[in-house]
From Swiss-Prot:
Keywords: Host cell junction, Host cytoplasm, Host cytoskeleton, RNA-binding, Transport, Viral movement protein. It is found in: Host cytoplasm, Host cytoskeleton; Host cell junction, Host plasmodesma. One of its GO terms (cellular component) is host cell plasmodesma. The lineage of its organism: Viruses, Riboviria, Orthornavirae, Kitrinoviricota, Alsuviricetes. The keyword RNA-binding applies. GO terms for molecular function: RNA binding. The keyword Nucleus does not apply. It comes from Odontoglossum ringspot virus (isolate Japan). InterPro entries: TMV_movement (IPR001022), Viral_movement (IPR028919). Transports viral genome to neighboring plant cells directly through plasmosdesmata, without any budding. The movement protein allows efficient cell to cell propagation, by bypassing the host cell wall barrier. Forms a ribonucleoprotein complex with viral RNA. Binds microtubules and modulates microtubule stability. Can bind double-stranded DNA. This is Movement protein. GO terms for biological process: transport of virus in host, cell to cell. Belongs to the tobamovirus movement protein family. Its main location: host cell.
Length: 303
C-alpha cells in the first residue's frame, strides 16, 4: 500500500528537468534574486500574468559570464540575455546582481575592482554606473547595483553595457583565469514611456471620484512640466522684439511687385503708395487694404 501511494505521488508531481545545462552557482544566483529589493510592485502586478499587464512587465535575464585572464579588462556583457523586449519600446535596467568567485587557493593576496559601464557615454564619470571592491581572500562574493534608468529597445539591442575589471596584487602566470564573474539583471520592459503623466491621470478619473476631468486637470499637468515654463518665457521675449517685416527700407516706402510694375509703366491712376499697411489710391477717397500687402505681412497666430 505504501509503495502504491508513493508511485501515485510521483505521477502527480513529476520531477522537473532542465532543457539547457547551467552551473550550480547560476541556479543559486537566480533563486536568490528578490524583485522586491529593486522595485515596488503593486498587488495587481504581483498576481496578474504578464499578458494582462499592458503597461510594463518585470523580467529576469539569464546568466551571462565573464572569465578574467588579464589584470585589466573591459568586456561587453549581455545584461538582457533571454529577456523578451518590446518592439519600439523601452527597457529599464532596474537592478543587477553580480556573483564572483576566485579561482585561487586560500589566503592569496590581491584584490579586484569591478565597474559597470555604459559605453554610450563619453565622460568617464557619467559612464560609470556602479563599482565594487573586494580582496582575493574572500573566495566568493555577491553584490548588487541599481542603475534604475531606461533606454530604448533599439539602443539596448546594440549591447551598450560593459564590465571593467581591475585585478591587482595577484601573482599568476599569464593565460590562466584568476576570477569568474556571473551577472543577472532585473528589467522592466514597456511600450509607452509615459508612466506617471497626464494620460494615467485622466484614465484614473472616475465618475463621482475626487478628481474631475476638467481643464484644470490639464493645466495642472502642464504647469508641472519645466519645459512649458521655458517655452512660455521664450515666446514672451520674442513677442517684445521688433518685427523684421518693416515697410521702409532706408527711410523709403517699399512697394510690392504689382504696384511697382504699374508705377513704372506710368499708370498714374493705379499708382499706390504703401504706408503702415494703409493703401491710398490716387483720386480715390476711400481707404482700402491691398490684398497682396495683407497676405505678405500677415503673421501666424498659431504657435
Amino acid at each position: 500500500m505504501g509503495r502504491l501511494r508513493f508511485v501515485v505521488l510521483l505521477s502527480i508531481f513529476p520531477i522537473k528537468t532542465f532543457s539547457e545545462p547551467c552551473s550550480t552557482m547560476a541556479l543559486v544566483l537566480r533563486d536568490s534574486i528578490k524583485i522586491s529589493e529593486f522595485i515596488n510592485l503593486s498587488a495587481s502586478e504581483k498576481l496578474l500574468p504578464s499578458a494582462l499587464t499592458a503597461v510594463k512587465s518585470v523580467r529576469i535575464s539569464k546568466v551571462d559570464k565573464i572569465i578574467s585572464y588579464e589584470n585589466d579588462t573591459l568586456s561587453d556583457i549581455d545584461l538582457l540575455k533571454g529577456v523578451k523586449l518590446v518592439e519600439n519600446g523601452y527597457v529599464c535596467l532596474a537592478g543587477l546582481v553580480v556573483t564572483g568567485e576566485w579561482n585561487l587557493p586560500d589566503n592569496c593576496k590581491g584584490g579586484v575592482s569591478i565597474c559597470l559601464v555604459d559605453k554610450r557615454m563619453k565622460r568617464a564619470n557619467e559612464a560609470t554606473l556602479g563599482s565594487y571592491h573586494t580582496s582575493a581572500c574572500k573566495k566568493r562574493f555577491t553584490f548588487k547595483i541599481i542603475p534604475n534608468y531606461s533606454v530604448t529597445t533599439a539602443d539596448a539591442l546594440k549591447g551598450i553595457w560593459q564590465v571593467m575589471t581591475n585585478i591587482r596584487g595577484v601573482e599568476m602566470e599569464k593565460g590562466f583565469c584568476p576570477l569568474s564573474l556571473e551577472f543577472v539583471s532585473i528589467c522592466v520592459v514597456y511600450l509607452n514611456n509615459i508612466k506617471l503623466g497626464l494620460r494615467e491621470k485622466i484614465l484614473n478619473v472616475t465618475e463621482g471620484g475626487p478628481t474631475e476631468l476638467t481643464e484644470a486637470v490639464v493645466d495642472e499637468f502642464v504647469e508641472k512640466v519645466p519645459m512649458a515654463a521655458r517655452l512660455k518665457s521664450f515666446r514672451s521675449v520674442n513677442k517684445k522684439k521688433p518685427s523684421n517685416s518693416s515697410k521702409f527700407v532706408n527711410g523709403k516706402s517699399r512697394l510690392n511687385s504689382r504696384n511697382k510694375l504699374n508705377y513704372e509703366n506710368g499708370d498714374s491712376d493705379v499708382g499706390i503708395s504703401v504706408v503702415d499697411d494703409i493703401v491710398v489710391g490716387n483720386g480715390v477717397s476711400d481707404i482700402r487694404i491691398d490684398d497682396d500687402c495683407e497676405s505678405f505681412d500677415a503673421q501666424s497666430d498659431s504657435y
